[in-house]
């Protein structure tokens, strides 16, 4: 696939039909402004030689990103992407984690080991328990 020719939305996904005829998708959680946009705002996009652009929303999606192997956010990514009120660095400091490393996990630049992922999920649950104790 060299370019996406048409797009459509379904739930929290953006789909694209490539010039090879195949359908591709990726999560809108990576593009919060696009996820929160109205149907009318989503319909006002431009397709260029390298990607799709929504000028009013200031959102760009490259064609290449439809080929990334991890279209679905991990559990950690999903949590922080859907709970913007929780600051990643603040969470890391509270629980003695490296803020830069946690941001790398959330942004997909690094992947935690299974053990580290379970530890972070446990800490997320601990934070939830603290909130319910109020």
Where are these regions (language model features)?
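Motif-centric detector for short Cys/His coordination patterns
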Residues: 1-134
């Amino acid at each position: 696939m060299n370019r996406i020719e048409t797009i459509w939305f379904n739930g929290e996904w953006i789909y694209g039909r490539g010039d090879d005829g195949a359908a591709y998708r990726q999560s809108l959680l990576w593009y919060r402004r696009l996820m929160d946009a109205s149907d009318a705002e989503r319909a006002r996009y431009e397709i260029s030689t390298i990607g799709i652009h929504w000028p009013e929303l200031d959102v760009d999606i490259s064609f290449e990103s439809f080929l990334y192997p991890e279209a679905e956010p991990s559990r950690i990514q999903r949590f922080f992407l859907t709970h913007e009120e929780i600051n990643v660095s603040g969470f890391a400091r509270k629980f003695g984690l490296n803020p830069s490393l946690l941001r790398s996990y959330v942004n997909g630049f690094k992947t935690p080991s299974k053990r580290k992922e379970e530890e972070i999920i446990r800490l997320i649950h601990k934070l939830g328990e603290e909130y319910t104790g109020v």
